[in-house]
Amino acid sequence: MAPNLRKSHPLLKMINKSLIDLPTPPNISAWWNFGSLLGICLITQILTGLLLAMHYTADTTLAFSSIAHTCRNVQYGWLIRNLHANGASFFFICIYFHIGRGLYYGSYLYKETWNTGIILLLTLMATAFVGYVLPWGQMSFWGATVITNLFSAIPYVGQTLVEWAWGGFSVDNPTLTRFFALHFLLPFMITGLTLIHLTFLHESGSNNPLGIVANSDKIPFHPYYSTKDILGFALMLLPLTTLALFSPNLLGDPENFTPANPLVTPPHIKPEWYFLFAYAILRSIPNKLGGVLALAASVLILFLSPLLHKSKQRTMAFRPLSQLLFWTLVANLLILTWIGSQPVEHPFIIIGQLASTTYFIILLILFPITSALENKMLNF
């Protein structure tokens, strides 16, 4: 009998082990779809980004008009741009759901997979930030100025670091050029990290909603989950195309329709919606260095999740108190997102400070305490 090429060919064998014959728990829910959706987001962003880069000019005098040219004169340029801009939003929606799933179902106990995932999140955030600067509108320019300026809060080397990042004494042509180079490079770095992420995941196999070992009754990935993933793709690409075609500027900032002007500051400088929660935490501390540290901690705190897991059960499926706390955390993040979009005035300042404090208290203190309490309740 001839050998099955799918199982014997060096390259096809790898694909087979990852996408076809991969043993998968039989009970993983739709919350497990977001990993593959992130893969589709990445592919979409790289393809649309590549097409946009072919028509983009990384120069302060030409960047804004080169994008206007892409939208007006390039075949379907408007569609490519709208898909790329809104694709970023969907990328973040998927990654936040993916992380939320990981927290809820205790997936962070696969430490290597979790840690590479956080590094992926940080790289994605960096990519989105440098990408937002490229259209060289008002919010692009001032967003770049405000966020890069935060590095100056680092003692002793801060100012040098900022001027080194800028390539001068303000955000100018060298900054735009290097941001374009970084925005082109980072997605490929994300692709590499994704492969590492998957390698670690396939070492242990997938977690499942019950948080128990499912080795005894695993099923092949194809056709069961390949079909389920394709349904997921359709359900994500439909709202993405709807948004890109019917309301492409819904999530953008109107300020960005004005070319960058270093002499005019916009009344409210704010990032894209997916960074607002972190921006609110940054603003809630009246000290520059303190704000920067809180901003970094808001994401880096995820590294502590495996260490703060005190429960005897892996998932929150049978832990009602932890569930309540988890959804309180979600509500809290939505409040932070709202606060980040508001001006710095009463009552938003105090709400932001309370929500920021609550965010850290829930993750660092209340989750471990609640887990310990639930462990006690198991004995009754």
Curated annotation (Swiss-Prot):
It is found in: Mitochondrion inner membrane. GO terms for molecular function: metal ion binding; ubiquinol-cytochrome-c reductase activity. The chain crosses the membrane at residues 34-54, 78-99, 114-134, 179-199, 227-247, 289-309, 321-341, 348-368. Keywords: Electron transport, Heme, Iron, Membrane, Metal-binding, Mitochondrion, Mitochondrion inner membrane, Respiratory chain, Transmembrane, Transmembrane helix, Transport, Ubiquinone. Binds 2 heme b groups non-covalently. Its cofactor is heme b. InterPro entries: Cyt_b/b6_C, Cyt_b/b6_C_sf, Cyt_b/b6_N, Cytb/b6-like_sf, Cytochrome_b, Cytochrome_b_C_euk/bac, Cytochrome_b_N_euk/bac, Di-haem_cyt_TM. Heme b b562 binds at residues 84, 183. It is a multi-pass membrane protein. Pfam families: Cytochrom_B_C (PF00032), Cytochrome_B (PF00033). Heme 1 (or BL or b562) is low-potential and absorbs at about 562 nm, and heme 2 (or BH or b566) is high-potential and absorbs at about 566 nm. Belongs to the cytochrome b family. The cytochrome bc1 complex contains 11 subunits: 3 respiratory subunits (MT-CYB, CYC1 and UQCRFS1), 2 core proteins (UQCRC1 and UQCRC2) and 6 low-molecular weight proteins (UQCRH/QCR6, UQCRB/QCR7, UQCRQ/QCR8, UQCR10/QCR9, UQCR11/QCR10 and a cleavage product of UQCRFS1). This cytochrome bc1 complex then forms a dimer. This is Cytochrome b. It comes from Pygoscelis papua (Gentoo penguin).
